[in-house]
């Protein structure tokens, strides 16, 4: 997992905008008595698509004036839908394949028609590649409803939705606060995870007419609903969109490093709605039935190419990502559905856990839609399973914030039958952590801060550290040793010089070992060995949470494992560009000072000092000085 520029390898290297809302496959409001069947409120399919071949037959396209992809897209909409009122949706971007994606929302009297959209795809040559259209073409309202305001108020709409859908929301005593001209927020409600909102908008109906509605948004956990209540009649709900899709994944559950540690399970809705509120199968523009969503897009990539959007990915009926797999199956392509599913699952869990620990939108995480939380969006992780560009490895490319990360998981040929890296969670976690460290060190806009030998080595070490911390088992102690990459490499020794261990007889590495090392993975093994010592010092002091997520008390994880993961992550953001071991150690100490007021100073110092990075340690690229000393207050 090499950190040169954008590549890393295991061994070498504001609001939700619904452009084309597609309801989830959920058929009812989850987990409640008297639940309403949401299939009754699905939005009808109205969109058309003009392909590239069809576009070439349209002579008017040739007359388009040259300009930016936004100008070209806007001109197309003007020519295709003359005299229509519309606005540009603020989520346009150019994908890594060079296609400019632009979306427009139709409006009437300045009010959105919420299910009337026009999306334009502009190629690298500046010409329209294709477009989709669901603009409303029926009769327009004769007058602006904002003039007479002869519609129900938003509070009536909220009460109407509560009653019609049997929602567990109480609004007695609630009041309305304006957010914009057509949107309000309800304050003082209970039963929802966030304050409900209502937006005045039109909905194009299946019968060809237009309805003025209040779009009431209610997040009740198992369901996140956009309910379109008729603005003239408070008992009529026209449509409902549920952001929450109920899906099952057959995978090796989080915490199992590889197939030798357990059996596959079927897990329902594995996402965390606090960190992935759109779930893993939606980006706020579309809900998907394949391995694609806000955080990642996973697919089969046998030719090893860079084009991914049209590659194969599993898309099961009823969102049941349940596919057969056994390590004895051969050839690997026979279980590609299971491989893509596993890769998608592990990477999304990484997203959710790292988000909890601080790798959020502002920090430069990987998401298409940042929902107004800061940072730059349009940068999910592209996940290529059984990538044909190599073997016996895996890698991760980390461009600056706003550009997608890319992970390639290869087939390993050191066993018979070959082994698929997607099924070794430790490998995938290591790769994803390259994205974490490269975005945090130097800031989201600079992915060039882990490219010196020692800092590049730490990039490898962080990947091993997080992969190892995640795989700790309930009965593990500081005497437990772990190897890295043992399963994929078909070797009990794994792919590192030594196992990760607190026993100096098992792993003798110290800071001055770096004087004889000139390769990032070897140096990374030294760094992770030090972090493993710190990890167990903190676990011995605070205990170990064996659950899949941390428990915070006043912003601090209440156990040693997640505390170590938190302060190591915070240290990445604190340290300078291209740090050395001494600077990174100090950054972790500073992170603990900031988080706990230095309550763990001695545990951290003792962990580093045991491995020669004590008080007197000094960096010199050719002659590092080691030290086992700790501050006087820690003796």
UniProtKB/Swiss-Prot annotation:
Cofactor: Zn(2+)
Glycosylation positions in this chain: 287, 475, 594, 623
UniProt cross-references to SUPFAM superfamilies, sorted A to Z: Metalloproteases ('zincins'), catalytic domain
Entry keyword S-adenosyl-L-methionine: no
Active site, renumbered: 431
Signal sequence region: 1-19
Compartment(s): Secreted
Cellular-component GO terms for this entry: extracellular region
Sequence positions that bind Zn(2+): 430, 434
UniProt xrefs under InterPro entries: FTP_domain (IPR011096), Fungal_virulence_M36 (IPR050371), Peptidase_M36 (IPR001842), Peptidase_M4/M1_CTD_sf (IPR027268)
Family recorded in the similarity comment: Belongs to the peptidase M36 family.
Function of the molecule: Secreted metalloproteinase probably acting as a virulence factor.
The protein, known as: Extracellular metalloproteinase 1
């Amino acid at each position: 997992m090499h950190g040169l520029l954008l590549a890393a390898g295991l061994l070498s290297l504001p609001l939700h905008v619904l452009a084309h809302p597609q309801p989830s496959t959920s058929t009812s409001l989850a987990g409640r008595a008297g639940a309403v069947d949401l299939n009754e409120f699905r939005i009808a399919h109205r969109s058309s698509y003009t392909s590239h071949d069809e576009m070439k037959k349209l002579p008017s396209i040739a007359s388009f004036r040259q300009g930016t992809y936004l100008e070209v897209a806007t001109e197309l909409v003007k020519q295709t839908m003359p005299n229509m009122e519309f606005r540009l949706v603020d989520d346009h971007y150019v994908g890594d394949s060079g296609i400019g994606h632009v979306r427009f929302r139709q409006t009437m009297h300045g009010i959105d028609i919420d299910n009337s959209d026009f999306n334009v795809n502009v190629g690298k040559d500046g010409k329209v590649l294709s477009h989709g259209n669901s603009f409303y073409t029926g009769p327009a309202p004769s007058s602006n409803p904002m003039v007479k305001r002869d519609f129900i108020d938003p509070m009536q709409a909220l009460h109407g939705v509560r009653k019609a859908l049997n929602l567990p929301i109480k609004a007695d005593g609630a009041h309305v606060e304006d957010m914009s001209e057509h949107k309000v927020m309800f304050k003082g409600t209970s039963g929802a995870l966030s304050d409900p909102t209502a937006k005045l908008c039109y909905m194009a109906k299946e019968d060809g007419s237009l309805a003025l509605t209040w779009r009431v948004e209610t997040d009740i956990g198992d369901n996140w609903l956009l309910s379109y209540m008729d603005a003239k009649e408070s008992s009529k709900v026209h449509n409902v969109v549920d952001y929450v899709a109920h899906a099952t994944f057959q995978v090796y559950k989080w915490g199992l490093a590889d197939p030798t540690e357990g059996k596959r399970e079927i897990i329902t809705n594995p996402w965390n709605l606090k960190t992935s509120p759109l779930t893993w199968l939606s980006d706020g523009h579309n809900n998907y039935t394949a391995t694609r969503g806000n955080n990642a897009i996973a697919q089969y990539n046998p030719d090893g190419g860079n084009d991914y959007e049209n590659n194969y990915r599993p898309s099961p009926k009823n969102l049941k990502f349940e596919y057969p797999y056994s390590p004895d199956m051969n050839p690997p392509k026979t279980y590609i559905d299971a491989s893509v599913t596993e890769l998608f699952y592990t990477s999304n869990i990484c997203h959710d856990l790292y988000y909890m620990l601080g790798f959020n939108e502002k920090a430069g995480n990987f998401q298409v839609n940042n929902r107004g939380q800061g940072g730059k969006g349009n940068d999910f992780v592209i996940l290529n399973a059984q990538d044909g560009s190599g073997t016996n490895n895996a890698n991760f490319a980390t461009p600056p914030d706003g550009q997608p990360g890319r992970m390639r998981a290869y087939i390993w040929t050191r066993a018979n039958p070959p082994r698929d890296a997607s099924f070794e969670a430790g490998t995938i976690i290591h790769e994803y952590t390259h994205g974490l460290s490269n975005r945090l060190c130097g800031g989201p806009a600079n992915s060039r801060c882990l490219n010196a030998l020692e800092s590049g080595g730490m990039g490898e070490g962080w990947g091993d550290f997080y992969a190892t911390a995640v795989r700790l088992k309930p009965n593990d102690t500081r005497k437990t040793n772990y190897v890295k990459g043992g399963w994929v490499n078909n070797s009990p020794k794994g792919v590192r010089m030594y196992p990760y261990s607190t026993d100096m007889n098992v792993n003798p590495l110290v800071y001055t070992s770096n004087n004889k090392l000139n390769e990032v993975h070897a140096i990374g093994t030294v760094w992770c060995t030090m972090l493993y010592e710190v990890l167990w010092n903190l676990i011995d002091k605070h205990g170990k949470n064996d659950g899949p997520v941390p428990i915070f008390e006043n912003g601090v994880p209440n156990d040693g494992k997640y505390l170590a993961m938190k302060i190591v992550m915070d240290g990445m953001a604190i340290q300078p560009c291209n740090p050395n071991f001494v600077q990174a150690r100090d950054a972790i100490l500073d992170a603990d000072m900031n988080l706990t007021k230095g309550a763990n100073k001695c545990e951290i110092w003792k962990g580093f000092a045991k491995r020669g990075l004590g008080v007197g340690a000094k960096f010199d690229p050719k002659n590092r000085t080691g030290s086992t000393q700790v501050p006087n207050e820690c003796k």
